[in-house]
Amino acid sequence: MGAVDTMEVFFEKLNTGDRAGAVALMDEKVEMRIHVGDNARTLRGVEQVGGWFLRAEAGLKMVPGEVRDLGITYQADVLTVRPGALSQHLDASFRVEAGKITSINLAPR
């Protein structure tokens, strides 16, 4: 499965409430970098990164908009929607190797 195929399955599972299924698409050594303001936080390993998605509010949706397929890298403008919160556009980059997500980078637009 290529990056685009893997990410389509990831977003489908995440947005239909199958968070565990979405997390199963992550490599054991996945890393995620989240940018907030002038700061960034890095999570390492499927326990930390997967846990971030598993603990997110019920109803979290991440909807990819403009997608750029760069081989093993999938980049997209992602609309994030959470109940009771303002929606947010993120610049998102996902690296996929052998059908597993190995790296995630999320930054506000």
Regions found by a protein language model. Give the residues of each.
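C-terminal and inter-domain tail/linker signature
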Residues: 1-109
